[in-house]
């Protein structure tokens, strides 16, 4: 593994979404949002469980009606991951899901009602120890801010966020996190930079409405990557017009790429050329699918020839360097074996699983020794 100086994260206060710590140095949480009808309890539960399986720390669920709130009660009883209820316009829905054990409320104080209604929601959240996320979005800025600035700007998003923060400050409530999302990468990044200088609360990162699976992943990687590399951000969501499971995968890929939080295999693979001695692309695609269940952090390099292969293998947990008929296998930088190119996928899967088990056992022993 390549050595690098750790990113110095912005200091923030600590809140808890269910049992997940947010801020104050806690691991950056990766979350997604269901796209089922919340009133379809079975479909929503199945999607949440699919998100849990790929590592989601938190899942947000839209609760637009009282019927959805009743469904939320049933959903909450069937899943383990903390749930955030996304509430707009009707403060009574927030009060209802609070009764049903919601782990966090995502509200916009600007559309939830008057001061008295906001106070009722905040008092309920305080009594039940439920944090709140203030969610500001460039696409739904208050009309007076639209008129003042003419268009969404970083200053407009900041002013909107601070207006809502002031709502909670006046009510002496500090268990909250804030987001200032936009679909434009530069607008979102600058808005978060400004906000990070103004408040101490945790920040939830996102490039909203980023696009489809490919373009949305690229936009999110650029925007979130810039902020995370500057130490800004305590939770994140990659917003894609795609299966929410992909949001979690891309989120962890961003964190892995920045070496902020490792989960699963970090594949290093060449784009291939006429020098490749085996099917690199097919091997990588197959292994990514077969090894999705592996959560052990490890770097695996799969290089088709001897130009860059040995160098990458030296800094990988496991590395393959393409050779004629057989390819070299490296473990922790040391050449260990040769693999038959015609059976590369099965052999490499077996070696990776064995290495993951070995690393897991070593960590288990380390934990036991520390506990003693």
From Swiss-Prot:
Reactions it catalyzes: (2E)-4-hydroxy-3-methylbut-2-enyl diphosphate + oxidized [flavodoxin] + H2O + 2 H(+) = 2-C-methyl-D-erythritol 2,4-cyclic diphosphate + reduced [flavodoxin]
Enzyme Commission no: 1.17.7.3
Pathway(s): Isoprenoid biosynthesis; isopentenyl diphosphate biosynthesis via DXP pathway; isopentenyl diphosphate from 1-deoxy-D-xylulose 5-phosphate: step 5/6
Entries under Pfam families matching the protein: GcpE
Textual note on the cofactor: Binds 1 [4Fe-4S] cluster.
SUPFAM superfamilies: Dihydropteroate synthetase-like (SSF51717), Nitrite and sulphite reductase 4Fe-4S domain-like (SSF56014)
Entry GO MF terms: 4 iron, 4 sulfur cluster binding; 4-hydroxy-3-methylbut-2-en-1-yl diphosphate synthase activity (ferredoxin); 4-hydroxy-3-methylbut-2-enyl-diphosphate synthase activity (flavodoxin); iron ion binding
Residues bound to [4Fe-4S] cluster: 270, 273, 305, 312
GO BP: isopentenyl diphosphate biosynthetic process, methylerythritol 4-phosphate pathway; terpenoid biosynthetic process
Necessary cofactors: [4Fe-4S] cluster
Keywords, alphabetical: 4Fe-4S, Iron, Iron-sulfur, Isoprene biosynthesis, Metal-binding, Oxidoreductase
The keyword Metal-binding is annotated on this UniProt entry: yes
Biological role stated in the UniProt entry: Converts 2C-methyl-D-erythritol 2,4-cyclodiphosphate (ME-2,4cPP) into 1-hydroxy-2-methyl-2-(E)-butenyl 4-diphosphate.
Entry's family note: Belongs to the IspG family.
Name this protein carries in UniProt: 4-hydroxy-3-methylbut-2-en-1-yl diphosphate synthase (flavodoxin)
């Amino acid at each position: 593994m390549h050595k690098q100086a750790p990113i110095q994260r912005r200091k923030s206060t600590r809140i808890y979404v269910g049992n997940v710590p947010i801020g104050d140095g806690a691991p950056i949480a990766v979350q997604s949002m269901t796209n089922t009808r919340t009133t379809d309890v079975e479909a929503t539960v199945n999607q949440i469980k699919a998100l849990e399986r790929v590592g989601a720390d938190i899942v947000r669920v839209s609760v637009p009606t009282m019927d959805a709130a009743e469904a939320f009660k049933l959903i909450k009883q069937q899943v383990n991951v903390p749930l955030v209820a996304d509430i707009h316009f009707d403060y009574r829905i927030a009060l209802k899901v609070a009764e049903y054990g919601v782990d966090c409320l995502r509200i916009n104080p600007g559309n939830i009602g008057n001061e008295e209604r906001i106070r009722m929601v905040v008092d309920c959240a305080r009594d039940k120890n439920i944090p709140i996320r203030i969610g500001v979005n460039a696409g739904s800025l208050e009309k007076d801010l639209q008129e003042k600035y003419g268009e969404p700007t970083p200053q407009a998003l900041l002013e909107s966020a601070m207006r809502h923060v002031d709502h909670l400050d006046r009510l002496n409530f500090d268990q909250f996190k804030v987001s200032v999302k936009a679909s434009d990468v530069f607008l979102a990044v600058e808005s978060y930079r400004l906000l990070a200088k103004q408040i101490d609360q945790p920040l939830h990162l996102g490039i909203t409405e980023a696009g489809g699976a490919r373009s949305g992943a690229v936009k999110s990687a650029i925007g979130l990557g810039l902020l995370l590399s500057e130490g800004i951000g305590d939770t994140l969501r990659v917003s894609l017009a795609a299966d929410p499971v992909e949001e979690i995968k891309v989120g962890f890929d961003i964190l892995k790429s920045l070496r902020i939080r490792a989960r699963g295999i970090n594949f290093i693979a060449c784009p291939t050329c006429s020098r490749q001695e085996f099917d690199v692309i097919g091997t990588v695609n197959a292994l990514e699918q077969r090894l999705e269940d592996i959560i052990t952090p490890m770097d695996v390099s799969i290089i088709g020839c001897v130009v860059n292969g040995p160098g990458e293998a030296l800094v990988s947990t496991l590395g393959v360097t393409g050779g004629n008929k057989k390819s070299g296998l490296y473990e922790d930088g040391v050449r260990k074996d040769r693999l038959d190119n015609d059976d590369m996928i099965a052999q490499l899967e077996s070696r990776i699983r064995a290495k993951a088990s070995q690393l897991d056992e070593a960590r288990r022993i380390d934990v036991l020794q520390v506990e003693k």
